[in-house]
């Protein structure tokens, strides 16, 4: 969504924030009496992307501030996109006024990516400098055929594989299905 917004308008101000970072920003700003600066920062967005909004449940002060930021962005016709692991109406300890606001927008349930897409995601993410694993297409397909839920689980499998490879001092270019089975034994059931 952020890339598309920049293509449409290269001058767009796009802010992405994982919810727990937002909560930390709010908590710190309240402690240092700089809440207005933080609100102005988020209100300056043309597009605000918030990951894991469900984690705001039970965080009363963060909900209060998010409500005001949301209203400002909505009233100025800015866009807000957030991810959530459930429909907003099902989030316990979420203020009703936020449930109402969240339900006014377009709510989509995203299906897990198909096998080929999961393999492509694994290949792309394995090239990230923090992971830096040399996966063959066959190995990526093998992992993707066993890790079917979501991108986070794919990333988790890659991180677990990297830790195993590093700990076992296996050459990063020699990652085979057997190595994957050793690393991801709880996810990968070897064929008998």
Question: What do these predicted ranges mean?
Answer:
Residues 163-192:
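Conserved alpha/beta core segments of nucleic-acid transaction machinery
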